[in-house]
């Protein structure tokens, strides 16, 4: 398939997912009692919101692991931790909020890491390793969850439990085969200037752990906001959350808005719609809007500081030149 065809197919898939999500949201939210949503918001225990916020902070802190692992994998180990933390937070938050995350995350990373003698090829390699970490974590989580609780997938894929369990075994088997392949010796992929050495067995296990922890922390943060329900456990929320975010990424919708909400409303019919909407509203505030505002402020402050520094240097150069002018 040629590049133009792939691009058109990608756009078509994105439009289809967003369109389906919009139709689903319209259908599920039609007739919803806004008063009950407000009442559910007011009734949400404050301690649950605080625990959810703490899990969100832990999840964003875990993002540093993505960039640190990628930087170590490409031999860039001299970047200060504060720079890595700043870059991972701002690139992920701004990139995934604007949509087209691969491009926007890369632009933010290049803007920061270019000051540390990194070129576009280095940024592409970082994107590859962070993407691998993310997908390995997702496959591991979904595979294990499908084996342990295959019924958690049923509301979304409408498949019988045994079929979902088979998919889970296939996912775990794929990871095991990948690990065995890596354990067979040094693995290098690519050609010419685009050649990278894949992490070894231990490194890949760490990579999977980073990705899994990311998914678990994020799903727990929304699970804490849901009212207690004996029919819904952590595993079910984890499954719905991972599938929802994957659909959001494929859709390229800014912040996956609408897509994630539609997936939750479909995947968790055990909850009253008003209670679920209230939980999603709170989750969006603490996991999306607040981090986005903070990331924009931090990035803008950095750019303003750099601009001020350049202006000061230009003024100093002008003064020096003037002092030597007869």
Task: Place the predicted regions along the sequence by residue.
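Membrane-interface alpha-helices at helix entry/exit sites of multi-pass transporters
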Residues: 82-86, 101-104, 115-132, 272-282
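Re-entrant/interfacial helical elements at transmembrane boundaries that shape
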Residues: 102-115, 144, 254-269
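Predominantly cytoplasmic-facing regulatory/coupling regions of multi-pass membrane proteins
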Residues: 1-89, 138, 147-249, 271-280, ...
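Mid-bilayer segments of alpha-helical transmembrane spans in multi-pass integral membrane proteins
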Residues: 92-101, 131-143
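Transmembrane alpha-helix interface/packing and boundary motifs in multi-pass membrane proteins
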Residues: 90-99, 240-261
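Residues at alpha-helix boundaries and short interhelical turns
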Residues: 78, 97-98, 117, 216, ...
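Internal, well-ordered alpha-helical segments in soluble enzyme and binding-protein domains
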Residues: 109, 119, 125-135, 139, ...
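Short amphipathic alpha-helical coupling elements at transmembrane boundaries
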Residues: 39-43, 72, 108-115, 125, ...
């Amino acid at each position: 398939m040629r590049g133009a065809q792939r691009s058109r197919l990608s756009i078509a898939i994105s439009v289809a997912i967003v369109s389906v999500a919009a139709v689903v949201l319209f259908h599920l939210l039609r007739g919803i009692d806004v008063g009950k949503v407000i009442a559910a918001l007011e009734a949400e225990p404050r301690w649950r919101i605080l625990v959810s916020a703490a899990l969100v902070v832990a999840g964003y802190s875990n993002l540093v692991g993505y960039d640190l692992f990628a930087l170590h994998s490409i031999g860039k180990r001299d970047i200060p931790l504060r720079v890595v933390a700043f870059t991972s937070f701002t690139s992920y938050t701004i990139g995934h909020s604007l949509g087209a995350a691969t491009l926007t995350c890369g632009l933010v990373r290049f803007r920061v890491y270019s000051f540390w003698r990194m070129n576009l090829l280095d940024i592409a390699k970082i994107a590859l390793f962070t993407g691998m970490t993310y997908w390995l974590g997702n496959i591991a989580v979904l595979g294990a969850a499908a084996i342990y609780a295959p019924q958690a997938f049923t509301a979304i894929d409408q498949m019988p439990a045994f079929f979902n369990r088979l998919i889970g075994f296939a996912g775990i088997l794929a990871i095991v085969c990948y690990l065995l392949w890596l354990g067979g010796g040094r693995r290098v992929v690519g050609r010419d200037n685009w050649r990278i050495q894949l992490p070894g067995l231990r490194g890949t296990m760490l990579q999977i752990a980073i990705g899994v922890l990311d998914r678990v922390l994020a799903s727990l943060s929304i699970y804490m906001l849901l009212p207690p329900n004996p029919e819904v456990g952590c595993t079910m929320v984890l499954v719905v959350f991972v599938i929802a975010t994957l659909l959001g990424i494929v859709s390229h919708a800014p912040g996956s808005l609408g897509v994630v909400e539609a997936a939750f409303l479909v995947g968790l019919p055990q909850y009253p719609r008003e209670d679920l909407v209230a939980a999603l509203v709170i989750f969006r505030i603490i996991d999306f809007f607040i981090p986005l505002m903070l990331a924009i402020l931090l990035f803008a402050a950095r750019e303003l500081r750099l601009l001020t520094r350049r202006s000061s240097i230009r003024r100093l150069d002008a003064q020096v030149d003037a002092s030597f002018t007869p």
